[in-house]
Amino acid sequence: MTPTPYYYGEMTWPQIKEAAAQGRVAVVPVATIEDHGLHLPIDTDVRLCYAACDGAVALVPDKAVLVPPVNHGYSPHHMDFPGAITIGWETFMRYMLDVCKSLVAHGFHRILIVNGHGSNTPFVDIISRLTVVET
């Protein structure tokens, strides 16, 4: 038996259409690129968030799809450290809302945004609410 595909980026559009029709949850990892001391890579938040989501979705591949991670978030307080990448909160919110609206437009009625960066938290909350209101 062929395993159920769940990596959104590796699926074909007919597979995505079928996944949405099946009522699967679209899991969206979101983090940022920032410093984590002298010993860890700057994409630590992204790696950890994605790994947690991957592990969870792998347990229920027929119930969820794993969307590619959103790598950039709101991190202006880390800009003193070379390598950090931040985007403005308005840009972050517009981008995330567009991602969520795209998923809804393709038939996903349940979206789980998994946040791997503390400073994204208030914006993720608002994005979740706006997705419900605007779709």
Language model region names:
Residues 1-37:
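Active-site and ligand/interface coordination hotspots across diverse enzymes
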Residues 5-11, 72-135:
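Active-site histidine-anchored catalytic micro-motif
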Residues 28-36, 68-70, 74-77:
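Short, conserved active-site loops that position catalytic residues or coordinate cofactors/metal ions
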Residues 45-57:
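Short catalytic helix/loop segments, enriched in acidic residues and glycine
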Residues 56-70:
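Active-site machinery of serine-nucleophile hydrolases
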